[in-house]
């Protein structure tokens, strides 16, 4: 298999693997901890703490009954758009852009599965900084944030590569 085909296959399989890791970690948390319980690992700095997020990032719209439907619709639309650009970036051999889009796609799909299946997103990764608790998140959130930062960096520092895809 030549390098381009190998990279294309890898970039297209990456979201599947990341979604699997996301869903398996959520399954572990749900079956290990009761809601709003967890376990600290590093001197009460890092812990797993099971929560159910009915909103979006940082629980935005969590208190709105219609919020889950709006978020699900927006997430589905964005996932489709990201996937279209992912396929296009692979076709033009822009693997750095494709990698960032794969991360974004995995993040969107991982949380979308939860929203459709459970009507909330399982969050569990928690960091405490003294009295401040950073908003609790999951593997899909990590993928989405890394993909977003990577895409912004590409657009700022390698604009010609991004232009080939858009």
Q: Across the structure, where does each feature detected by a protein language model lie?
A:
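Alpha-helical transmembrane bundles and membrane-interface segments of multipass inner-membrane proteins
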Residues: 1-166
